[in-house]
């Protein structure tokens, strides 16, 4: 089956094994990247495929996979520091919402002079952003294309919403084969959450013919898969 490519901002690629061609896709934004990688992807072999694709295309990269279950501002500060020291051209985030969230913050604040906590306290970033390429392992990140992202403040352990610039994510690659890293219970949970998102999209006041068509098809496919589970 051919890939389904959306020519919008950000660009979206849907297709089996599309993640294995990430080395081809990212060359538009540079040749030196920081790869944020969910550590669980080492076990499923997904990380090896990502690294091989980048290597085959002569893309220079380094891996940051020190990502706990609930990453906070300390983890993000560490990732941001490494990114600045490496003078990268862009960021590739491969994993679930927590990994993509770190990627959004690092891409947003890469060119900022002020530190992360200044923005956690309410300031809005104004500098340019670093190109961000996301490879979500699930389709449930509601902040993926938004101008904000949740982050735990390590000082108070409170969850805060960090304001970001618009259009940080330049490309999102959705590869259904990446779901092999999920357990059966996780697949069921993600399916129900995705169904709720499709329903919310359908009844939204901002919906249109195109979004309704996608939402209807999504609900049909999800319900069908749940019936067969």
Predicted regions and their residues:
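ATP/NTP phosphate-donor binding region
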Residues: 1-90
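A glycine/threonine-rich phosphate-anchoring loop and its flanking beta-alpha core
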Residues: 10, 111-210, 218
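Active-site pocket-shaping loop/turn-to-helix segments
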Residues: 37-41, 207-216
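Conserved strand-to-helix beginnings and helix N-cap segments that scaffold or border functional pockets
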Residues: 47-48, 73-76, 103, 144-145, ...
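Short Gly/Thr/Asp-enriched flexible loops that form oxyanion-binding sites at enzyme active sites
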Residues: 50, 80, 99-113, 145-148
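Glycine/serine-rich anion-binding loops at beta->alpha junctions
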Residues: 87-104, 137-143
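A conserved active-site cap/scaffold subdomain adjacent to cofactor or substrate pockets
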Residues: 215-229
């Amino acid at each position: 089956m051919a890939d389904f490519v959306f020519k919008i901002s950000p660009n979206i690629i849907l297709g089996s094994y599309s993640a294995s061609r990430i080395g081809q896709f990212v060359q538009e934004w540079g040749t030196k990247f920081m790869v944020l990688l969910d550590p669980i992807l080492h076990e499923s072999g997904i990380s090896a495929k990502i690294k091989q694709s980048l290597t085959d295309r002569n893309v220079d990269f380094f891996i940051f996979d020190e990502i706990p279950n609930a990453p906070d501002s300390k983890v993000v500060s560490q990732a941001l520091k490494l990114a600045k020291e490496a003078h990268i051209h862009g960021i590739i985030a491969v994993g679930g919402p927590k990994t993509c969230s770190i990627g959004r913050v690092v891409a947003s604040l890469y060119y900022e002079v002020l530190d992360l906590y200044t923005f956690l306290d309410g300031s809005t970033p104004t500098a340019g952003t670093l190109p961000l390429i996301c490879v979500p392992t699930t389709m449930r990140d509601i902040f993926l294309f938004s101008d904000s992202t949740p982050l735990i403040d390590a000082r108070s352990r409170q969850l805060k919403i960090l304001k970001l610039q618009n259009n940080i994510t330049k490309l999102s690659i959705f590869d259904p084969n990446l779901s092999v890293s999920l357990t059966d219970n996780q697949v069921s949970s993600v399916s129900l959450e995705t169904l709720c998102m499709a329903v919310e999209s359908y009844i939204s006041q901002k919906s249109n013919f195109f979004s309704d068509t996608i939402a209807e098809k999504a609900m049909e496919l999800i319900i069908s898969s749940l019936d067969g589970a």
